[in-house]
Amino acid sequence: MARDAAKLEATVAKLKKHWAESAPRDMRAAFSADPGRFGRYSLCLDDLLFDWSKCRVNDETMALLKELAVAADVEGRRAAMFAGEHINNTEDRAVLHVALRDTSSKEVLVDGHNVLPDVKHVLDRMAAFADGIRSGALKGATGRKITDIVNIGIGGSDLGPVMATLALAPYHDGPRAHFVSNIDGAHIADTLSPLDPASTLIIVASKTFTTIETMTNAQTARKWVADTLGEAAVGAHFAAVSTALDKVAAFGIPEDRVFGFWDWVGGRYSVWSAIGLPVMIAVGPDNFRKFLAGAHAMDVHFRDAPLEKNLPVMLGLIGYWHRAICGYGSRAIIPYDQRLSRLPAYLQQLDMESNGKSVTLDGKPVSGPTGPVVWGEPGTNGQHAFFQLLHQGTDTIPLEFIVAAKGHEPTLDHQHEMLMANCLAQSEALMKGRTLDEARAQLQAKNLPASQVERIAPHRVFSGNRPSLTLIHDMLDPYALGRLIALYEHRVFVEAQIFGINAFDQWGVELGKELATELLPVVSGKEGASGRDASTQGLVAHLHARRKA
């Protein structure tokens, strides 16, 4: 069926009315009255558990949210994506990152062309190159083995590889991986200064080979290699992830060290492609294929499972409920796993660049809020930084906890138990809170004077009723990581379809790029700032003055 705008509008109205009527409901009472609440509001896919029972929903909520998904034609849009239709309507492109991890022998067609053989060809080339670097068969110009790789990219060419490489640290048995993204010269200077060009491979990740930040850093790295080892050494110390073969050749990188990808792969969905080359070199091709396999398992589940049993769909519906119906403008991602320290930043781009839109697919203003602000830090660090606001602040911010049942350090299992206890304690505390009477009783048990009890007790009250959801898997391994990332990718898709927006373009990134190009000669003093707004003129003048001071 097609998207039913009238039914969608009516269902949203029902949801808003339902929220207004059910919002005062106490979550403690909901759990006390319903022993089966956890069972009804949780789902499993193998060892992966998704629990949303601490969110402020009931059976009516879930029935209306399913009705919403049907009215928005989530299933039809999902089928169109998997079929290779051009669902990115503003760029007239297919959206097929799912094909990058599809190892089946069936066809995946884009404009009548089966793309799976192309995907396999690039993956096999990546694996051969990674094996060569890891084994030492592919050496540097002086004959030394490569000990360090530096990935130069930005946005999707950086955030995914950084996140995955850190997450899979226990599986590293290849060269050390480093990442440079920022145009700030301090980033590349600090990265290169402890390294030896003779044992360093630099990967330049830019589809067009024109990204300003990436190419500026790449030229700095090229000079670093050439100044030490000579111009002839450049080819042996660089590889590229790009489709601009002419520009790559002009840079000095041989064609057999260039790995391409396709316009149906968006940057923030590209870690599964050749953009993941630094991950593959760090953990090996076999582990990288397990990473892809985990994502493919989630793809199959998302494609085939009915709406009410579908993890990405339910995660997306809860996300929509929190943002558009409850009015929560922010979403905190809290992985209780230090190796997932860059996951919040990765999901920040995935979600905010996808769903930070204000017009619908047909170019009309949206009728309500779209994507939330996404942010977070690992637990338990966040508890000692911003959880105060989450527990007692005036804004309600839903939390998404992620934790593994087992860690990678068996001799430190007691610390992992402490980690798990903290994760569960936070979700329980946010839901239950503490009443004024409970705060008084706690203080009275310390034999404090009555006047002190009355003075302090209000400060120790927690409202509770603060929603959180929890994702638990067995262990953070390549398969689990791939599955987790694909879960969030498809969640973004579901929310976008209900919002009625295009999740696969990012025109908001472009204006700043254009103005930065215009302002560079102004900042460097080659042109005047006349014609700019008074603030920009004042800022330029101050920068010029301070640079001369």
UniProtKB/Swiss-Prot annotation:
Chief location of this protein within or outside the cell: cytoplasm
Enzyme Commission code(s) on record: 5.3.1.9
Gene Ontology biological-process annotations: gluconeogenesis; glucose 6-phosphate metabolic process; glycolytic process
Main EC class the enzyme belongs to: isomerase
Active-site residues (renumbered): 353, 384, 513
Keywords for the protein's UniProt record, in alphabetical order: Cytoplasm, Gluconeogenesis, Glycolysis, Isomerase
Subcellular location: Cytoplasm
UniProt pathway annotation: Carbohydrate biosynthesis; gluconeogenesis; Carbohydrate degradation; glycolysis; D-glyceraldehyde 3-phosphate and glycerone phosphate from D-glucose: step 2/4
A GO term, aspect molecular function: monosaccharide binding
Reactions this protein catalyses: alpha-D-glucose 6-phosphate = beta-D-fructose 6-phosphate
Record GO cellular component, one term: cytosol
InterPro entries referenced in this protein's UniProt entry, alphabetically: G6P_Isomerase, G6P_Isomerase_C, Phosphoglucose_isomerase_CS, SIS_dom_sf, SIS_PGI_1, SIS_PGI_2
PROSITE patterns: P_GLUCOSE_ISOMERASE_1, P_GLUCOSE_ISOMERASE_2, P_GLUCOSE_ISOMERASE_3
Family: Belongs to the GPI family.
Function, in words: Catalyzes the reversible isomerization of glucose-6-phosphate to fructose-6-phosphate.
Annotated protein name in UniProt: Glucose-6-phosphate isomerase
Organism of derivation: Brucella ovis (strain ATCC 25840 / 63/290 / NCTC 10512)
